[in-house]
Amino acid sequence: MEDQPKDREAEVAGPWFSKWERQCLAEAEQAEQLSPELQEEAAADAAGLKIERQRLWHLFQISATAVAQLYKDSGCQQPGLSMWDPFQNAAMAVTSLYKESGDAYQRSFELGVQVGYQRRVRDVLEWVKKGRSIIRREDLISFLCGKVPPTPQPPRTPRMSPRPPAAASTQAAATESGTPVGVDLQPFHEAIALHGLSGAMASISMRSGPPGSSSQDGGIASSGRWKSSFLENDPNSLSSEELTLLLDSGGVRKRTSAQFGDGSADSPLHKRNRMV
């Protein structure tokens, strides 16, 4: 009855293993059986354990009797008898007891080592048959040593600073894109100076004047802003000659407007209105 559950368990665990694994398990199960010589010794030690003990006990009795006889003969020594024979008998009995005891101990030790090795292999195979495809090193060492594996340590947290959330980074990028950035016009002035246009651009202001400035300054500033914006939008579309003509036309327009202002002030109509 006990063999049937084992056979069923082996049949259930069979599909878990490959053909090579099944072959190895079969060889291991066959190797669990002792060799004929060891089987005889094991049978002699298992079935005839009492006989071995009785033999050692018999040798001990012989040794004890020989020692007692040696003591007895030494107390009542008869003339003509030598003490050598009782002493020799006692020494031989004790020596035989020592040899037989040593041989029995060696046989028991070798048999115990082999039985323990086979038992360990059998236990490991039974543990593997439980369906574990991967065996950790800690589990195997703890199983072979008969100890409980230590509890796993918690994973260490990285020491790097946490990344900002995506919403915060998007908001920061939007804020940076929305803020006005000052344009550095120093390279533009240097490029004009290299083309010999520094004198023409000297009268152009890149910034608007203060609130108390005159309308003429505001016009100059507005024309300067228009030209600077035009040049910033398409600086490569104009050549140096076209840029010079454009700047000169702006200067003529400013001068003609100033002349018209002066002429209107000296006109008779203006004087007549002032006299009235």
Curated annotation (Swiss-Prot):
GO MF annotation terms: ubiquitin protein ligase binding
Biased composition, class Pro residues, residue ranges: 149-165
Region feature (Disordered): 146-182, 204-238, 252-276
Lineage top rank: taxon: Eukaryota
Nucleus keyword on record: yes
Chief location category: nucleus
Segments of skewed composition (Low complexity): 166-179, 208-219
GO cellular component: nucleus
Subcellular location: Nucleus
Family matches, as InterPro entries: HAPR1 (IPR040308), HAPSTR1-like (IPR029196)
Pfam families linked to this entry: TAPR1-like
Annotated spans, Nuclear localization signal: 252-276
BP GO terms, sorted: protein stabilization
Biological role: Together with HAPSTR1 plays a central regulatory role in the cellular response to molecular stressors, such as DNA damage, nutrient scarcity, and protein misfolding. Regulates these multiple stress response signaling pathways by stabilizing HAPSTR1, but also independently of HAPSTR1.
Family statement drawn from the similarity comment of this UniProt entry: Belongs to the HAPSTR1 family.
Protein name: HUWE1-associated protein modifying stress responses 2
Organism annotation: Mus musculus
